[in-house]
Each structure stands twice: as structure tokens, then as C-alpha cells.
Amino acid sequence: MSRTVRAALLQTEWTGDKESMIDRHEEAAHDAAAQGAQVMCFQELFYGPYFCQVQDPAYYDYTEEIPAGPTTKRFQSVAKELGTVLVLPMYERVREGLYYNTAAVVDADGTYLGKYRKQHIPHVQGFWEKFYFRPGDGGYPIFDTAVGKVGVYICYDRHFPEGWRALGVNGAEIVFNPSATSRGLSSYLWKLEQPAAAVANEYYIGAINRVGIEPLGDDDFYGTSYFVDPEGKFVGDTGDAHKPELLVRDLDMDLIKVVRDRWAFYRDRRPDAYGDLTKD
């Protein structure tokens, strides 16, 4: 029996306040579910602006506890109501002064399954993330959801192939890459890195990028969200480069086995030969 997962991504622009951003994403989750979506991922730091264009402690106020905070709780209820797996990229507070760039994963019955904390934190013009986030400490977890084995790899993480591979070794079938990435800096990489990672690791990737220029800086977020399959092929069209868009795509999960039987990368990999990768 064939296995197909209908998956959704939302790329959107900053609305001006946290509550309206949360409302927009909840509405989009309902729209996606109405189209049959079984799993959905939001963009990086989904309920806020991309405040890392500046270094301002006022934005620490965007932090919430996960899963005890109100946004996780709210979307647990949404997930249960809709029967949809939700991936929620947020700004996590552990305690005052200790914050992470995190994605919570909620199963289709509303159960909180766990979190992924962004491992690689940039600190360059327009992306002053070390001011806000501590590097992740939770490894590369895989979440056993109603639609299969889901992983998360956030934005700047995507430039580091080691994490993509760790997610594959840990059993990922779909990996979501919620991002906030700017046209002038990385657009030439956007359609190269994730397809290459999907091929090398033989799973689906959902890549999400916000859209628009926000009041905090010159970063021009270019959308162009997409799903890519284990053969490196885009699943349907990519998202618009300038406008908010909800993407809903059917993922043929049987293709994963076909590709892994064709290219036995997991059989042929050589962990014993990779010691150099752990050296500074």
C-alpha cells in the first residue's frame, strides 16, 4: 500500500505585532488542514520580526517557555482540533538570560513531542544571533509523529552537512528547515544546499523562508519556500519570492525506500574514517 503525506509550509511577512502573527499562523493551519494537510511547519521565529538585524535586549521579551508557554499550549489545541502535526519555531526562554532558537514539535493529537534547538549560531552584519541565542544542546532528535519520522534543522544550520547527516542516521524521513534568509546574502545557495542535502541523506526537506523587508534593517527575505524529494527534485513549484504563500504538497514517502535501495549511502558510509570531523 502506497504511503503519501500531504505537507504544508507557510511563508509570510511581519504583520507588526506578535498576536496578529500568531493569529495569521493559526488561520493558515486551518487553511492547510482544509486542503488535507497532515503536517505543517512555520518559518523561523514565526511570531516575531527577525529582530537579529539589531542587538536590542527589548526583544528578549519575545521569549517563551517551551512547552509551558502560551504559544505551545495554544497550538497543541490547534493540532488536536485539526489532526495536524505542527512544527513551531519559537524563541525559547529557559530562565532569564538563557535563550535558544528552538522549534517545538506537536503531534496530530496535540501531544507535545519535544524540541530541537538550533545548533549553529551566526554573528555577522544583519544576523547578530549570538546576542540572542545560545547554541543548541539537544543533539539531532527525530520525532515519531502521526505522519512519520520528522526532524528539524533551523536556518543557518543548513550550511553544515554534518547535522543533515546526523538527522538521517537518526532515522529522519522529513526534515524541516525554517529560515529567515536574505536575498543579497544567500539566495544563490537556497536552491542548492537543501536539494543536495536531500539527495545525500535520502529524505524529504521542507525549506521555509519569510518574505519582505522589515523595519529593523535591510534584510530582504525572499520566500521561495519549497519541498524537495530524495532525488533532489522540487515537489511542485517553489513559493513566491515576494508575497506570503501557503504551500501544500503531496510527498510520496515510498520514494525514500526506492532511493535508499538504489544508493546505499547508509551502508557505505565510514564513521570510523571521519575522526577529522571532530577536530577543531
Regions found by a protein language model. Give the residues of each.
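N-terminal active-site segment of His-dependent metallophosphoesterases
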Residues: 1-38, 176
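Short, glycine-anchored, charge-dense loop/turn motifs used at functional sites
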Residues: 7, 105-113, 228-236, 240
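Cys-nucleophile CN-hydrolase/nitrilase-fold catalytic domain and related Cys-dependent amidase chemistry
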Residues: 18, 26-109, 115, 181-201
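Active-site catalytic loop in hydrolytic enzyme cores
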Residues: 64-67, 77, 94-173, 183-196, ...
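CN hydrolase (nitrilase-like) catalytic-core segments centered on the catalytic cysteine
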Residues: 67-87, 149, 155-245
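Short beta-strand scaffold segments in enzyme catalytic cores
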Residues: 88-90, 102-105, 141, 225-227, ...
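Residue-level detector of high-confidence beta-strand sites
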Residues: 102, 115-117, 177, 237-238, ...
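A conserved C-terminal secondary-structure "cap"
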Residues: 254-280
